[in-house]
């Protein structure tokens, strides 16, 4: 093999001028204008959305229906405006009161399509993180409600029955049906119950930030409607097969007494009853006070009486509509008009079962008996909470732990009190105290189990001394408590995802990953953690090992700085029985890296010995070029190791696009891994990020090139030509035969070679990231000079075509699998939707 020449390490990318016809732009203008007229949108928001749409369309290739991208632009513009209200001086609501569901209807766009496209739009439009967080919250809230409605449908069918003269679950009838005025029909009963729940959960959003609490609230609403049906003696609406019915409910002299059916549908009955007596009653009292509902305030009956039912349904609808317009969320009433089972796309996109990480699969308990059933998020979350609640009776350290002495225990309780105050200050829910109490109970249980296991493993050690040593270890107690809090948050399916606990308690990921293995070992062996929770712990440990622990401010870099370089290899850390924290950390990193290399090589159908060679390249990057991991992701280095091996070996396949496709099939895969790779720190102190092509070409190859060549025994050939190590995201252009343009004429087109193209004496060159902006402006003026100028109105932004023509240089999709031998310093790569590109280069016109 020939040794690669450093001069031939460039990544070829073609930047082209994609001209957009005036007719096409005129059609877009007209379609956008008509869409805004249908929505009755204000002019300012309309212009703002259109400008954003044009700006993004100039930079990115927007595939699919244009109206769908317009929908994203309009929604973004609407959410970033405020509308004055008449409720008080200077009072405003966020948004311009354009309904999201109405917007989707006008754009002929499904909820599933919107949820997918709006996330891509956030990336393409470079929207602020605050807005991205709002979109994630919107997505998550709807996913929870979608799953709850599926349970709602099942429970309602168990309790109530549809009279023979009514159509059950007819589409749209619940929104537009005609029924006898004043009398509650089966479909309207379904409507009022679902709307009552929607209004109740929005009344106190902080109380329903998790799946389990929202489910309990929904059961409380169903319980209330059930009692009202019994009180009105609407036996025609009751399912006689329901097990929770009073024994004498069919008798003529039946008198209704408060009857609770929570135990029929809640595994955690006490928690649901506590909510019914406190939070739910407070919400209903506020509804009566605000005249949102009418009936007997004390007994909460009479909601379905002929004189109250219609106005209650109307009032709940108005209240919910006002809320939806003010927050810009999906109108979740539409779920009443559809069968959730028909929406396979939404089912796939809703709350999914936890993925199985590659590491520590042997610690997972056996699949439960119902494992063959379809994953049910509500049941899974309830089971998780129920399992942790079994330890809720433990309110203080066990007698075994107390043997450490009063002074040590007092210090331990002081640490826990300090942690609790931090949690209560940052957890956005009135349930914060009960959540932490559950975590604290589990902490006391785990602490007892861990210390007793230590005694069993070291029977000769002094008990008192061991207890004092362990219980007094501050970082051990803090990380163990944080791990218990994380388990409780995961069990309830709250919106606060890892690494929130690290920020809450100011813990480094390097310190936190130490405790996870201990918790998993004792939790799985004692049976206090089920399969789902252990999967979660394994997953967040991998997150620490792959990314968080390698952050610039991580304590691991202090240890690396004081260690003897190069860092120990896989063999060294496994032979060292007296390994320290750094060695144990590297042992976990090496194992994780090896498992992922094996998985990717298997997906790529590489030969059996290939993973070992790639492993040695990866190991060298950790031991000798450790800086490659600083502020970066393990998978970024693994993908680069695979590709540099392929390039040195001169293999035709797989391409880099194949590597990325295989990576996207991994359980831990996220797009940001190849879209946003840390490069350097800017002058203003902010991190500079580029795509993985730039990182591979300009950072990875210069550091790893010589080692890979030496390790794989690449030698120069006679001609002295070199292979190309570096990555080209542009497809390889193969020589093609002359192509016949049409069958009716003997007209052929053949490709010109590069040396046939005559250079223009008046050429203009613009180098991205290097040339000043005025050069690009001059180039654009040159291009626009020969174009006809059409005026369609006096309105700025939408009227003058000259101002909105997309004659600027447009980005071309960069596909990362071309092995052409071109210099990266002479070409440029640009990112588009769903792909990545390299650094800027030159463009001629």
From Swiss-Prot:
Transmembrane segments: none annotated. GO terms for biological process: cell differentiation; chromosome organization; DNA endoreduplication; eggshell chorion gene amplification; endomitotic cell cycle; intrinsic apoptotic signaling pathway in response to DNA damage; maintenance of mitotic sister chromatid cohesion; negative regulation of apoptotic process. Keywords: Activator, Cell cycle, DNA-binding, Nucleus, Phosphoprotein, Repressor, Transcription, Transcription regulation. Its main location: nucleus. Residues 376-706 are annotated as: Pocket. The modification Phosphoserine is found at residues 760, 771. Functions in cell cycle regulation. Component of the DREAM complex, a multiprotein complex that can both act as a transcription activator or repressor depending on the context. In follicle cells, the complex plays a central role in the site-specific DNA replication at the chorion loci. During development, the complex represses transcription of developmentally controlled E2F target genes. Forms a complex with the DRTF1/E2F transcription factor through binding to a C-terminal region of E2F. This binding inhibits the E2F-mediated transactivation activity. Component of the DREAM complex at least composed of Myb, Caf1-55, mip40, mip120, mip130, E2f2, Dp, Rbf, Rbf2, lin-52, HDAC1/Rpd3 and l(3)mbt. This is Retinoblastoma family protein. It comes from Drosophila melanogaster. The lineage of its organism: Eukaryota, Metazoa, Ecdysozoa, Arthropoda, Hexapoda. The gene is Rbf.
């Amino acid at each position: 093999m020939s040794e690669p020449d450093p001069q031939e390490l460039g990544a070829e990318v073609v930047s082209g001028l994609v001209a957009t016809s005036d007719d096409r732009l005129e059609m877009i203008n007209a379609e956008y204008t008509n869409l805004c007229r249908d929505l009755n949108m204000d002019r300012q928001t309309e212009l703002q959305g259109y400008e954003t749409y044009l700006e993004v369309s100039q930079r990115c290739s927007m595939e699919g229906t244009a109206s769908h991208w317009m929908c994203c632009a309009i929604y973004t513009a609407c959410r970033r405006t405020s509308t004055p209200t008449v409720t008080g001086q200077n009072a405003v609501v966020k948004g311009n009161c354009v309904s999201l569901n109405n917007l989707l209807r006008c754009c002929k766009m499904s909820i599933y399509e919107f949820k997918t496209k709006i996330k891509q739009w956030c990336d393409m439009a470079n929207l602020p993180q605050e807005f991205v967080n709002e979109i994630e919250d919107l997505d998550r809230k709807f996913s929870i409600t979608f799953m709850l409605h599926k349970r709602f449908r099942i429970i309602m069918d168990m309790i109530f029955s549809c009279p023979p003269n009514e159509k059950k679950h007819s589409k749209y009838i619940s929104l537009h049906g005609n029924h006898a005025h004043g009398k509650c029909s089966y479909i309207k009963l379904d409507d009022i119950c679902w709307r009552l729940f929607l209004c109740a959960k929005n009344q106190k959003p902080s109380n329903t930030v998790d799946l389990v609490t929202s489910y309990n609230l929904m059961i409380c609403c169903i319980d209330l409607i059930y009692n009202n049906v019994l009180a009105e003696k609407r036996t025609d609406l009751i399912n006689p097969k329901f097990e929770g019915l009073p024994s004498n409910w069919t008798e003529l002299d039946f008198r209704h007494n408060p009857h609770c059916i929570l135990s029929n549908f809640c595994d955690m009955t006490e928690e649901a009853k506590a909510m019914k007596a406190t939070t739910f009653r407070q919400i209903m009292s506020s509804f009566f006070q605000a005249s949102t509902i009418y009936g007997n305030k004390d007994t909460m009956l009479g909601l379905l009486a002929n004189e109250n039912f219609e106005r209650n349904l109307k009032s709940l609808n108005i209240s919910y509509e006002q809320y939806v317009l003010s927050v810009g969320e999906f109108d979740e009433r539409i779920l009443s008009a559809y069968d959730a089972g028909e929406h396979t796309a939404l089912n796939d996109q809703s709350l999914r079962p936890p993925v199985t990480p590659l590491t520590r699969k042997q610690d997972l308990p056996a699949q439960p008996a119902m494992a063959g059933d379809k994953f049910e998020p509500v049941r899974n979350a309830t089971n998780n909470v129920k399992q942790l609640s079994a330890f809720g009776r433990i309110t203080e350290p066990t007698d075994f732990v107390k043997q450490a002495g009063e002074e040590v225990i007092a210090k331990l309780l002081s640490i826990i009190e300090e942690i609790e105050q931090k949690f209560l200050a940052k957890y956005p829910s009135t349930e914060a105290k009960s959540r932490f109490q559950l975590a604290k109970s589990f902490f006391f249980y785990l602490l007892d189990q861990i210390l007793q296991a230590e005694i069993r493993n070291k029977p000769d050690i002094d008990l008192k001394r061991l207890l004092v040593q362990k219980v007094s270890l501050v970082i051990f107690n803090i990380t163990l408590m944080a791990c218990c809090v994380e388990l409780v948050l995961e069990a309830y399916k709250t919106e606060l995802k890892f690494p929130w606990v690290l920020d809450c308690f100011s813990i480094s990921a390097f310190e936190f990953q130490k405790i996870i293995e201990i918790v998993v070992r004792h939790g799985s062996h004692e049976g206090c953690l089920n399969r789902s929770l252990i999967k979660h712990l394994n997953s967040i440990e991998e997150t620490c090992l792959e990314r968080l622990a390698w952050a610039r401010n991580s304590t691991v870099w202090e240890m690396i700085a004081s260690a003897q370089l190069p860092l120990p290899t896989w063999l060294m850390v496994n032979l060292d029985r007296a390994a320290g924290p750094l060695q144990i950390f590297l042992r976990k990193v090496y194992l994780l890296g090896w498992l992922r290399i094996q998985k990717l090589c298997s997906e790529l159908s590489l030969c059996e010995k290939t993973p070992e060679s790639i492993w040695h390249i990866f190991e060298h990057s950790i031991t000798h070029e450790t800086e490659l991991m600083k502020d970066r992701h393990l998978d970024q280095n693994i993908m680069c190791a695979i590709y540099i091996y392929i390039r040195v070996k001169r293999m035709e396949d797989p391409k880099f696009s194949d590597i990325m496709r295989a990576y996207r099939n991994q359980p831990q895969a996220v797009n940001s891994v190849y879209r946003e790779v840390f490069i350097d720190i800017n002058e203003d102190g902010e991190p500079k990020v580029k795509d993985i092509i730039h990182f591979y070409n300009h950072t990875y190859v210069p550091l790893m090139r010589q080692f890979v060549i030496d390790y794989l025994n690449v030698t120069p050939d006679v001609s002295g030509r070199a292979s190309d190590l570096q990555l080209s995201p542009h497809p390889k252009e193969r020589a093609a035969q002359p192509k016949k343009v049409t069958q009716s004429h003997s007209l052929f087109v053949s490709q010109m070679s590069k040396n046939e193209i005559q250079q223009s004496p008046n050429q203009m060159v613009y180098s991205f990231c290097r040339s000043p902006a005025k050069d690009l402006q001059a180039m654009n003026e040159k291009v626009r000079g020969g174009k006809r100028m059409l005026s369609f109105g006096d309105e700025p932004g939408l009227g003058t075509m000259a101002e909105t023509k997309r004659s600027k240089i447009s980005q071309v999709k960069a596909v990362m699998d071309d092995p052409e031998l071109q210099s990266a310093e002479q070409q440029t790569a640009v990112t588009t939707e769903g792909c990545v590109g390299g650094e800027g280069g030159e463009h001629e016109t």
